[in-house]
Regions:
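His/acidic metal-ligating clusters that form di-metal
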Residues: 28, 87-160
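Metallo-beta-lactamase
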Residues: 31, 125-133, 165-167, 171-177
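Core catalytic region of metal-dependent phosphoesterases/phosphodiesterases
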Residues: 2-93
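Short amphipathic alpha-helical segments
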Residues: 18-19, 45-47, 122-123, 162-165, ...
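Active-site environment of divalent metal-dependent phosphoester hydrolases
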Residues: 11-16, 40-42, 64-70, 116-118, ...
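Active-site-proximal beta-strand elements of phosphoester/diester hydrolases
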Residues: 3-11, 107-114, 168-172
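Acidic, His/Gly-rich catalytic cores of divalent-metal-dependent hydrolytic chemistry
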Residues: 162-243
Length: 243
């Protein structure tokens, strides 16, 4: 049996990332995949990138990781770019978009927001037709098969549902979670790289972390307009939709 931890949307929140990595380690899980948005919103994207590179076997690109490399006049984005530096920006620019593998006889596809784009936002309350497109392949995918299990991130909203015998789930967010102010991640349980049907499980984990430390980090970092971010990590509610 293989266990794979899926973390995502860290957004430069190091106390949250540390708490999640500690929980994963305590469970004896050695394989970690990151589904993007390492940076942005929170103060320490630089440390988040370095930690993810150290601890994660696979990393895919999120919307923040994608647009942060583009030239901009936005002072907030410039602050994050400066903080990251050219080597980390290059690393983010080169990340792949999709992870695909067999597990317990199921074809699993993981991506940040949709199989088509890091900028397509799909919510659990969208209509079934739209949700079903998350199982589809796209030119970004390495394989044309329809996924049996599709997992994504982006919306900071952990959920799990079955659609016509297929399984859709969202990891939620490590560093900027909604619903409740606790870090969220997912564990996949199954037989990796096996085409034979076998037990398969998706587990959702919530990890409390020192929120006031994240607040302190934001205040001490000199990041522009930390107020919204601080309210978000304290309450688990978006203050402005700049995500």
């Amino acid at each position: 049996l293989t266990q794979i931890a899926l973390i995502s949307d860290i957004h430069g929140n190091i106390p949250a990332l540390e708490a999640v990595l500690k929980d994963i380690k305590q469970r004896g899980i050695e394989t970690i995949y990151c589904l993007g948005d390492l940076i942005g919103k929170g103060p320490h994207g630089d440390i988040a990138v370095d930690m993810v590179r150290t601890h994660c076997q696979q990393v895919i690109k999120g919307n923040w990781d994608d647009f942060i490399g583009k030239e901009t006049d936005d002072p907030v984005l410039q602050w994050h770019q400066h903080r990251l530096g050219s080597v980390r920006l290059q690393y983010l620019a080169e990340l792949p978009y999709i992870l695909e593998f067999m597990m317990s006889g199921k074809w699993i596809r993981l991506f940040h927001a949709s199989p088509r784009s890091v900028y397509e936002r799909i919510q659990p309350w969208d209509d079934q037709e739209k949700l079903e497109t998350l199982f589809h392949s796209s030119p970004l995918c390495g394989d044309p098969r329809i996924a049996d299990v599709a997992g994504y991130a982006d919306i900071h909203n952990a959920y799990h549902q079955h659609l016509d015998g297929r399984t859709l789930f969202n990891t939620g967010s490590v560093g900027n979670p909604l619903e409740m102010p606790e870090a969220s991640y997912v564990i996949l349980d199954g037989i990796y790289d096996s085409e034979d049907p076998a037990p398969f499980n998706i587990q959702f984990i919530r990890v409390p972390y020192p929120i006031e430390q994240a607040v302190q980090d934001a205040l001490e970092s000199g990041m522009p307009s930390p107020k919204e971010y601080i309210l978000e990590v304290r309450t688990g509610r978006y203050q402005v939709r700049k995500d």
